[in-house]
Amino acid sequence: MKDTKEKVLVIPCSGIGKVQGLIAREVALQVADERLPEHTKTLCLALLVKGDEEAVAAIKASRCITIDGCQKLCSNKNVELAGGTILRSIKVAEAFKDHKGAQPGTATKLETDGWQIVSDLAATGAGEVMAASEGKEQ
């Protein structure tokens, strides 16, 4: 993994089988691939859980944004265990409070409400990355 020292790592939960997990992964991809590819990089949580040396080293050398679908906070907890610095912990489940009655979709396909939640959370994550890159960590 190159350039991780300068880039913020975005680590979503795996969240297999849950719409919140799909939202977490889509938020990570939107931040890292679409909004701020020059400032961010994604890291697969499974590599970190497995103890992959390269993944652990990247976590220790980088600032991170974790994105968790549920209250188990797997991404957040594993980044902390690996010694990472967490700029922001985004919790998808909490976002549903701002979207009461939303019909986000399923574990495999997001509907319009789900994409709106992704967009809102990606804006939060991107804002955090930009603040950090300007030295104004929130």
PLM regions and their residue ranges:
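Iron-sulfur-associated redox domains of electron-transfer enzymes in respiratory
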Residues: M1-Q138
